[in-house]
Structure formats: C-alpha cells, structure tokens
Amino acid sequence: MGSGKDRTLAGWTLPETKTDATAQFDRFVTENRFTIAVVFPLVGAVTLLASAEGLLPDPLAFNPYFVLFGTFVMRLPLVAGIFPLVDRRAGLALVALTLYSYGIELVGVRTGWPYGEFTYGVDLGPMLLGDVPFGLPVFFFPLVLNAYLLVLLLLGNRAASTTVRLLSTLATVMLVDLVLDPGAVAIGFWIYEMPQFYGVPWQNYAGWLLSGSVAVLLFDFGFDRAGLRRRLRDCPFMLDDLVSFVLLWGGINLFYTNWVPFGLAALLGAGLLWTDRFDFDLSETRLGRAVWR
C-alpha cells in the first residue's frame, strides 16, 4: 500500500518495493524487447564494421561511450532477469567475480599470462590502473551467465548433476569465446602477438578455461539454481542478451568470412531456437505498436 505521497515522475511510478521494481523492469524490457535484442546488435554490428573499415569519422569510430552504452542496453534483459534473485550471497559472488575479472585481466595485460601477449587496439573507455577497461564486468559477466542459463534450459533435469552442469557450462563459455575473440580481433578491438586461430593464440583459450572455470563456480555458488529455473520459466526474455551476441558477433564474423566462428555462432543460435522462447509477438513491443498503429 502506498504512503500517500506522489511517487510519479513523468508518467512513471517510482517503485516502493523490490517486487514493484521487478515488475516495472520486466515491463520495460518486454515493451522494448525487439529493439533491445535485435535492433541494437544489428546497428552495433554495422557501426563497428564501419569503424573498422574507416567509414566513420574519428568522433564516432569506435566511440567507447557508444560501445559501452550499446552493450549495457543489450544486457538489460539479463539484468532484469536476475535482478529479483540477487540476494546477499549472489551479491558477494558478483563482487568476488568483479575483483577476480579485473585482477586476472590486469595480470594478462602486464605479463601475457594466461591469455597470451596482447594489446587493446581501440579505446574501450576509462581504464582501471591505466591498463584494464573499467567496463570489463559489463563485457565479461554476461558471457558466462548466459552460458550457464542456456545449459539449465537445454539440459533440464540433467543439469541437477554438478559435474554435468559445470562442465557443460564451461564448454559453452569456450564456444562463446571461439565466436567472440576472432570477431574482436577482426575489427581491431585487441591484437595478439602470436596469431593462430583467426588471429587468436591457442593460449588465449587455455586462459579462458581458467577464468571461465572460476566464473562458473562463483555463479553456481552465488545463485539459487531453483530460483534461476523459476525465473527462466516466467521470464521469456532472460536469454535475449545471448540472441544479441549471436547477431552481433555472428554478423561480424560473417563479414570477415571467419567461417568457423560464424558456424559456432549459428550453433549457439540453434541452441537458442531449441529452447523455443523467441517467437514473440511484435505487437507487444513499442516498436511494433509504432509500426502497425
């Protein structure tokens, strides 16, 4: 029950409880689902390719704030999905993973271990200690959590086995990186001194086995699996961020004829289609209502 005070701002009611905030967040993502999951990654792919090919002027080419903003928007379905599940334990796991991701990236940049010698090829925004992008968790966390959620959906009851769940998630994380890194190298996000698989050293994937294992274990420790299953059941957009990933990086790999990474992106897309969660009604979205009004 409200306090009687006016809690409305520009037609938006300020939530009084976490339940209210969850409902409003869900409604916002649902109403903008197509724009977030499809339009943003397609526009992102075009602008990144235009930047890499020298078709955009300097103020726009690889603009780090545009990149961060677009990435953050594409993460909204995942953030909304896990928002009601973040309790003290999950919060501690996220803090630990944040510190770990900054730490291992800093070691990687300065020593070449565990990912191989590399440098950033473009400005990725504010840097922590001058070496690590401050926005790193926005890029890294979702890759692992999306893999974890996809495994829960695809394996069903088989995911109750800790060994099966964790190994399957780690394999999916590696699949994600086999799509991401070749595309990122192709557009010049980062440059490795020992290019091997589409410009990426095999050592990088060994490094991802390490960092991915730690991240998967922390997510498995921090989040209630039964709660995640319920949320996945009730929240059809929860894996839309992975849809965005497939469209964005699959498109970039296709442009540069990176056929193996593109095929792996298609495999991820097939896994998403298998979950039968993305045949949504455009008339439920703001974009659809604007087009068909």
Swiss-Prot record:
One of its GO terms (cellular component) is membrane. It is a multi-pass membrane protein. Pathway: Carotenoid biosynthesis. It is an enzyme of class 4 (lyase). It is found in: Membrane. Keywords: Carotenoid biosynthesis, Lyase, Membrane, Transmembrane, Transmembrane helix. The keyword Iron-sulfur does not apply. GO terms for biological process: carotenoid biosynthetic process. It comes from the Archaea. Its EC number is 4.2.1.161. It catalyses: bacterioruberin = bisanhydrobacterioruberin + 2 H2O. It holds the Pfam family Caroten_synth. The chain crosses the membrane at residues 36-56, 66-86, 89-109, 134-154, 171-191, 199-219, 254-274. Disruption phenotype: Cells lacking this gene accumulate BABR. InterPro entries: BABR_hydratase, CruF, CruF-like. One of its GO terms (molecular function) is hydro-lyase activity. NCBIfam families: crt_membr_arch, CruF_Halo. Involved in the biosynthesis of the acyclic C50 carotenoid bacterioruberin (BR). Catalyzes the reaction that introduces hydroxyl groups to C3'' and C3''' of bisanhydrobacterioruberin (BABR) to generate BR. Belongs to the BABR hydratase family. This is Bisanhydrobacterioruberin hydratase. It comes from Haloarcula japonica (strain ATCC 49778 / DSM 6131 / JCM 7785 / NBRC 101032 / NCIMB 13157 / TR-1). The lineage of its organism: Archaea, Methanobacteriati, Methanobacteriota, Stenosarchaea group, Halobacteria. The gene is cruF.
